[in-house]
Amino acid sequence: MSRRHSAEKREVNPDPKFGNIVISKFMNSIMYDGKKSVAENIVYGALDTIEAKTKQSPLSVFEQALENVMPTIEVRSRRVGGATYQVPVEVRSTRRQALGIRWIIAAARGRNEKTMTERLSAELLDASNNRGNAVKKREDVHKMAEANRAFSHYRW
């Protein structure tokens, strides 16, 4: 890993339907092999399903789900002497968002519904109500940080 230049952030265009950058990032994370149209169909299908089920704005449900999944603190390994400590550190806002998106997608892919659209809509609904595997993942990360609070003075 080069220490000379940090990679510059690329501009992400907002999605065509809602004009939302976060939804666009979400689609890009779902996408396999550059098949954006498939990813769009999955995400928009899931959001339409959410709207039909809840009679609420799908965007507000999505944002609530993401907010409930994003971690505020995580642990990072730090080597001190011969020992490796799990040191709790705060998570930057960009990483919080990326982790939240990643965890929702991973949890949706691990579900048992038939199509990805159904899985994603179910996981987003669960996450917006503080349930589901994505929220459980965040709770586990927070528990790890809480358990290792004694090492917080090793922060960098």
Swiss-Prot record:
Transmembrane segments: none annotated. The gene is rpsG. PROSITE patterns: RIBOSOMAL_S7. It holds the Pfam family Ribosomal_S7. InterPro entries: Ribosomal_uS7, Ribosomal_uS7_bac/org-type, Ribosomal_uS7_CS, Ribosomal_uS7_dom, Ribosomal_uS7_dom_sf. Keywords: Ribonucleoprotein, Ribosomal protein, RNA-binding, rRNA-binding, tRNA-binding. Gene3D superfamilies: Ribosomal protein S7 domain (1.10.455.10). Part of the 30S ribosomal subunit. Contacts proteins S9 and S11. This is Small ribosomal subunit protein uS7. CDD domains: uS7_Bacteria. GO terms for molecular function: rRNA binding; structural constituent of ribosome; tRNA binding. One of its GO terms (biological process) is translation. It comes from the Bacteria. It comes from Afipia carboxidovorans (strain ATCC 49405 / DSM 1227 / KCTC 32145 / OM5) (Oligotropha carboxidovorans). One of the primary rRNA binding proteins, it binds directly to 16S rRNA where it nucleates assembly of the head domain of the 30S subunit. Is located at the subunit interface close to the decoding center, probably blocks exit of the E-site tRNA. Belongs to the universal ribosomal protein uS7 family. Coiled coil: none annotated. GO terms for cellular component: small ribosomal subunit.
